[in-house]
Amino acid sequence: MYAFDYHRPTSLADAKTLYAQLEDPMYVSGGMTLIPSMKQRLAAPSDLIDLSSLSELEGIEQLNDAQDSMLRVGGMTRHNEVAGNALIQRHFPVLGQVAAAIGDNQVRNRGT
């Protein structure tokens, strides 16, 4: 694995600023795909920006506007949360089924 610098921003705005300032950064959340790729030398970012502590990227919520009703699934929402969410099961049951079938339970608890 190549050397890299690790950053853990405290807000989404900080993460965006870091990304714009760094040479060849990559965002990391669960790390289930990126870290093995780095170990195999298939990816070599100069910096990793860890998004896992940014609560504004988590969760599932219903959005209502004048034309339609939509769901927002945050990028840091774990697969198991998607699989078990009542809104997902009601409006997009296939998405819940797919999320429940990803990997094993450890992957679903960690993967985003």
Model-derived features: where do they sit?
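C-terminal structural segment of proteins
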Residues: 1-112
